[in-house]
Amino acid sequence: MEFIVSCINRGSRFAYCVNLGERITIKKVDITCSPGEVIEIDDYSKPVPEGSRRKFSDKALRLPAIETPIKIGITDADEITKRMWPKIEAAAMLIARKVLLSIPVIIRFHNDADGSSGAVALHRALRAMLESKMSTERLNIRWIMNKGVSYGTSEAAADKLWISNYDCIEKPLMIFIDFGTSVDSNQGVAYMGDSTEIVWLDHHPIEDGFCGKGLEHYINPWLFGGDSSYTAGLLSCILSKAISNLDTSIMEDASLIGDHSRYARFSDDGVAISTILDMITSDPEIVKTSNQITPAEIERILESKKRREELLHYARIRSEEAMAAASKSLRKHQLPGAKAFISDFKKVRKDGTKYPLPGRFASMLFDRLSASEQEPCILMLHFGSYISIRMDARLNAKVGMRSLIAEEKRRHEEVISSGGGHDLALSIKLKDESDKEMIIRDILMLVTERLGKGKDANDQNT
């Protein structure tokens, strides 16, 4: 039998070999091999005979065939996919290569329905690819649910420490799904340096100065004539199809629904799975004791019809309780031709619960408000040092909320830590939560000015 020694775990002295479904324990069998060698052995539990090694040749590796084009039946989205296809194809080939070579891979995905649906699709694709090679899932693929919206130095330091355990035939691989397109990620990327290769799948608007834009495998629909409605989860599903040609339609639906995409297809399964993903990524303790959750664990939950029904019932109860509490505590501002609503999340969610998360509840509440109001709406929901903003597209066309937040950051550099997001869904992080009422008033003033009226809105309780 012939195996490529792809990497060696320094701490525990495991050798990971291509086409071998198990690890060779170096301490047990006195194997003195190094990454990049091809070894020929009849029994991997015995020492490697002399003269059985040779250098790895690139030609020995067969990558999965990738056929084009991949379509989902949504004309605009399919056109964007077509424009992104060379980048998607290259990223899929790179991911397949690293996994088949057993190179260490870290996959970070955002903790919401969009990020987790993309992670589940990729998990299924990699599992199918490995099974087609009659191999087990590699133990050196690490899945991390990323709670923040950026990739900071603390995350990078943890990743670099894990990667440092390995001597590899090639550079390890980092994959980011649905987060990180921010200048706040620059330090994390710089910290990693050239120690890894990176595949970055995102759909957030690209901030000026964001260094990830220049990476070879950074893929974002904004660079190809698209926008945030082409979600990161959808992008990950398309890439996953390229790897293993699986049906990812339900995860596509869950992603599009979860991120309020205009491409959303409201299938029953899509709505149910989007709700479940949203809940268990908001509060992993609902399904386990750890604050982390992996795609494999998500799949075990989704496979149980009884568990799915229990979680959906719980989600409906918690959402309605939160909605009722929010309705009682809303403040309303009358703007010129529009309405603004302010919600204090402390008055919404019960103590000790994590679902719904503030940002996701802001979207739920805004949908309810905009459906009941004839005038365009803006909602600002505040929680701790954060302000989550949702806005009607008609209002945004007049106001330009992303540029308004950029102006607000320039005006209050000493107060605002960070801010940004999509056109209609943004957030601001403050250095001190005591400043949030001042920032909310200032945003209302700027919105009013941009609507062509130079007066502050009149605050009143609903």
Model-assigned labels for residue ranges:
Residues 35, 53-108, 115-116, 124, ...:
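An N-terminal, well-structured beta->alpha segment
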Residues 199-200, 204-219, 403-414:
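Flexible glycine/proline-rich, aromatic-decorated loop/lid segments
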Residues 18-33:
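Beta-strand/loop nucleic-acid-binding surfaces
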Residues 341-462:
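Glycine-rich, acidic loop segments that terminate in or are immediately followed by a histidine
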Residues 111-114, 125-201, 206-210:
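N-terminal small/polar loop signature for handling phosphorylated ligands or for N-terminal nucleophile
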Residues 13, 44-53:
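Short, Lys/Arg- and Gly-enriched loop/turn segments at beta-strand edges
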Residues 100-107, 111-113, 208-352, 363-372, ...:
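A structured phosphate/pyrophosphate-recognition subdomain
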Residues 1-11, 38-41:
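Structural detector for short beta-strands of small beta-barrel domains
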